[in-house]
Amino acid sequence: SVHHQDSSDEPSESSHPCCDLCLCTKSIPPQCQCADIRLDSCHSACKSCMCTRSMPGQCRCLDTHDFCHKPCKSRDKD
């Protein structure tokens, strides 16, 4: 599989950090983690990405933030 790093302004699923299932603790500040599963890669802003060894790999970003990224599924497409 070929991975392209391009700096175009085209929004692509892999390059923009987004999260549909974001889990936060009730602490202040909250500790939020994205539980989304992506195939073969995590979004570009992810520092700690963990993937299964299956084909294709199921990847989760293990980063913790005090916020959630915007949802990946845009509401205006349907």
Curated annotation (Swiss-Prot):
Pfam families: Bowman-Birk_leg
SUPFAM superfamilies: Bowman-Birk inhibitor, BBI
The keyword Disulfide bond belongs to this UniProt entry's keyword annotation: yes
Record-marked site positions (Reactive bond): K26, S27, R53, S54
Any one Gene Ontology cellular component term annotated for this protein: extracellular region
SS bond list: C18-C72, C19-C34, C22-C68, C24-C32, C42-C49, C46-C61, C51-C59
Keywords from the UniProt entry: Disulfide bond, Protease inhibitor, Serine protease inhibitor
Similarity section: Belongs to the Bowman-Birk serine protease inhibitor family.
Note: The I-A sequence is shown.
Protein name: Bowman-Birk type proteinase inhibitors I-A, I-B, and I-A'
Organism encoding this protein: Phaseolus angularis
